[in-house]
C-alpha cells in the first residue's frame, strides 16, 4: 500500500503575522491527517521570519490531540543552536 508523507517547508511572507503562519502550518498537517497521510516532518527554522518554527518538537506536540493517525518527525534540529542535553530531553 502506498503511504504519503509531507515535509513542511514553512515559507511565508516575512511580514506575515507569526500566529497566522503557525496556524496555517498546523491546518495543513491536520488536513494531511484527514487525507490519510502517514507522516508529517517539520524542520527547525531560526534563520528568517518567513520560516517561524524554532521548535519542531513543540510544533508537532501541539498537533497530537488534533490528529488521529499521522506520525510526526523532525526534519532538522540545529545542534549548534542548543545544548545537546536539551535536545535529548525534548526528543525523549
What do the PLM-derived regions correspond to, one by one?
Residues 1-74:
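N-terminal beta1-alpha1-beta2 module of alpha/beta enzyme domains
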Residues 20-23, 80-92:
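Glycine-rich anion/phosphate-binding loops
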Residues 73-81:
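Conserved strand-turn element in the central/C-terminal portion of the radical SAM core barrel
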